[in-house]
Amino acid sequence: MQNETEIYTLLQDLCQKGEYSDYGCCLDEIEIFIDAAKIINTSKHVCIICDWQWWDLNVEELNSNSDSGLQQYPCIIMANYVIEDQAGRFNQGDWVRSSVLTQFHQNCIFETSNTFYLLVGTGTRKSLNQDKIKAKAV
């Protein structure tokens, strides 16, 4: 019964919107920030998203990725709507969840080890604690 309660609590936390965030760019700025991402790293694809949530994962620590030397921060993006994915992994209208943040640029470019997520419009930000994250993995 305890496991069901933990899952229910996790689902409640995941469904809550979180606090308003002023990150994100305007629709008419998308091309400007795609170009900015390409200046940072020409080999990474851009995934343009809206209706997004920034999740701060309250975990003890994420280590540097020893293979790439990248620092990872305990944050991910979950978006309910993909506008465009330059890599062709997702269709317009799909939802997506990123891997962990490696860098955040210009208030709207969420960089992971292999992708730039361009946050369009306003979104929300919330925290999930380590115990709830572990419960999700069960």
Show where each model-derived region lies:
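N-terminal non-globular leader segments, chiefly Sec-dependent signal peptides
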Residues: 1-104, 122-138
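Amphipathic alpha-helical packing elements
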Residues: 107-121
